[in-house]
Curated annotation (Swiss-Prot):
Name used for this protein in its record: tRNA-2-methylthio-N(6)-dimethylallyladenosine synthase
Oligomer and partners: Monomer.
A Gene Ontology cellular-component term: cytosol
Gene of this entry: miaB
Cofactor: [4Fe-4S] cluster
GO MF term set: 4 iron, 4 sulfur cluster binding; metal ion binding; N6-isopentenyladenosine methylthiotransferase activity
Classification lineage: Bacteria, Bacillati, Actinomycetota, Actinomycetes, Frankiales
């Protein structure tokens, strides 16, 4: 240990969240330790997003708040990485000269060296690589959750959407070999993970660089053969590349969740053409129809941008029509904002802000109405919930706990009544496996699995205020308790050091004590969260 503490602050999408896990692993491998809650870190790292305009504002606002902190904290260092750093480079120092290190998306592994060099030379260090130097999955990683984990299957993107700057910042798509992906999945499950999310900018194009265009469906099926892996999710697919073999794999692989997040972006063929999205509304709705035919209980969510340059009222009406037809369980909705360096930023017919805001309000109102109706249909249904921490912001006040159903819906439930060990006979939602008689543990913990009955619905969540129908303690729950209390047990305990914090390993990463669950999309409006408009925002 070098005696210095660190904090990583993450803006943006799941890619950034997973990269931040790697930054934590790199720093801890270099001897840094996480700052204590409420403490003042010696090193603050910002992992930035460049997709939306307010991403810049959030970064520089946060950097400004650290000026007096740094003046009163001798030796403190500030580093800025991620997509905005890759884009703006040394210009960050022009706006925030108190920053010590700027690094990009292709050289995460250089952070500890750059911090040490900046300290030794007493001068800011800017190092931006033009291409990926080390595949990120080979880096040390400190996972954010004991029970859920991201697993990258590719990095970069070969699409050329006119509103998106990500390909120029993340590079062209590079795929991991299926054997490497499965080795990581198996290692995570051996440590107690119950759920993994396969991660890529466009998971449906996975395998092309390996000479196997059908590799993604095969990978899903292979995940179904991993003993102990209970839930498999993926994000994000692209409608252009979405094929029926993936639908079949989702429907026939028992641990693949019946949840699909598929970005629509617009329901107007004219706007989709200007966006260079390479599909049209009929193809999108055809995929939705085939998914629902194969999996009637599937929860389908999406991303939608309103106010794209040239969007007319008729174009917007087409989007509303698709939303009504698709009946999404939730949508991440965005007001278009031009990003320098993208073709859309210089297009004619930019839509005025008042019109964009009006359309956004109307879209959100329609989607909330649909989400609420879809959720009300689940009242009285039995759901299996993987318990998490940080999902329910009001859990402390309401006395509830929270987690995700198999279809990705957020469920707030009461855990203060004894769970029954009987199997029950009520209907189940989200494709949950039938309950079996279990020994009920006295305390429900993040990482455990419960079954409960939905008693109330809201547009963005379900509530279950009745007694639990079952509760299954898991090794992930044991590990959470160990990290919180310094005790615990089970096989998970054997993989923890004496202080209850999991180790950081190279290549096959380790899990981390409690932190907000990285599970993917559900009904929410994320426009104010500085989120990515082409990959699903993550809740923090």
């Amino acid at each position: 240990m070098n005696g210095r503490s660190y904090e990583v602050r993450t803006f943006g999408c799941q890619m950034n969240v997973h990269d931040s896990e790697r930054l934590c692993g790199l720093l801890e491998s270099a001897g840094y330790s996480p700052v204590d809650p409420g403490g003042e870190a010696d090193v603050v790292v910002f992992n930035t997003c460049a997709v939306r305009e307010n991403a810049d504002n959030r970064l520089y606002g946060n950097l400004g708040q650290l000026v007096p902190v740094k003046k009163g904290h001798p030796g403190m260092q500030i580093a800025v990485g991620g997509c905005l750093a890759q884009k703006d480079r040394a210009a960050i120092l022009d706006r925030a000269p108190w920053v010590d290190v700027v690094f990009g998306t292709h050289n995460l592994h250089r952070l500890p060296v750059l911090l040490e060099r900046a300290r030794h030379n007493a001068a800011a260090q800017v190092e931006i690589a033009e291409a990926l130097e080390v595949f990120p999955s080979s880096l040390p990683t400190r996972r954010a959750s004991h029970h859920s984990a991201w697993v990258s299957i590719s990095v970069g993107c070969d699409n050329t959407c006119t509103f998106c700057i990500v390909p120029s910042l993340r590079g062209r798509e590079r795929d991991r070999r299926p054997g490497d992906v499965l080795a990581e999945v198996e290692a995570l499950v051996a440590e107690g993970a119950l759920e993994i999310t396969l991660l890529g900018q466009n998971v449906n194009s996975y395998g092309r660089s390996l000479g196997d265009p059908g590799a993604f469906a095969k990978l899903l099926a292979a995940c179904g053969r991993v003993d102990g892996l209970e839930r498999v999710r993926f994000t994000s697919p692209h409608p252009r590349d979405f094929t029926d073999d993936v639908i079949e794999a989702m429907a026939t692989t028992s641990n693949v969740c019946h949840q699909l997040h598929m970005p629509l972006q617009s329901g107007s063929d004219t706007v989709l053409r200007r966006m260079r999205r390479s599909y049209r509304r009929d193809r999108f709705l055809g995929i939705v129809e085939r998914v629902r035919a194969a999996m009637p209980d599937a929860a389908i969510t999406t991303d939608i941008i309103v106010g794209f340059p040239g969007e007319t009222e008729a174009d917007f009406a087409d989007t509303l029509d698709v939303v009504r037809a698709a009946r999404f369980s939730g949508a991440f909705t965005f007001q278009y904002s031009p990003r320098p360096g993208t073709p859309a930023a210089t297009m004619d017919a930019q839509v005025d802000r008042a019109t964009v805001a009006d359309r956004y309000t109307r879209l959100v109102a329609l989607q909330d109405e649909i989400s609420w109706a879809e959720n009300r249909a689940l009242v009285g249904r039995r759901v299996e919930v993987l318990v998490s921490e940080g999902e329910g912001r009001k859990d402390g006040a309401t006395g509830r706990m929270s987690g995700r159903a198999r279809d990705g819906r957020l469920v707030h439930f009461r855990a203060d009544e004894a769970a029954s060990s009987s199997t029950g006979s009520g209907p189940r939602a989200g494709g949950a496996a039938p309950a079996v008689a279990v020994a009920v543990a006295p305390t429900v913990r993040p990482g455990d699995v419960v079954e409960t009955v939905v008693t109330r619905a809201a547009p963005h969540h379900l509530t279950a205020d009745g007694p639990l129908r079952s509760h299954r303690a898991t090794r992930a729950g044991d590990a959470w308790a160990l990290g919180r209390d310094g005790d615990g047990g089970g096989a998970a305990a054997a993989q923890q050091p004496a202080d209850g914090r999991p180790i950081v390993t190279l290549g096959i990463p380790s899990l981390r004590p409690s932190s907000p669950d990285p599970v993917g999309p559900a009904s929410a409006d994320a426009a104010s969260a500085g989120a990515d408009a082409c990959c699903t925002p993550v809740r923090r």
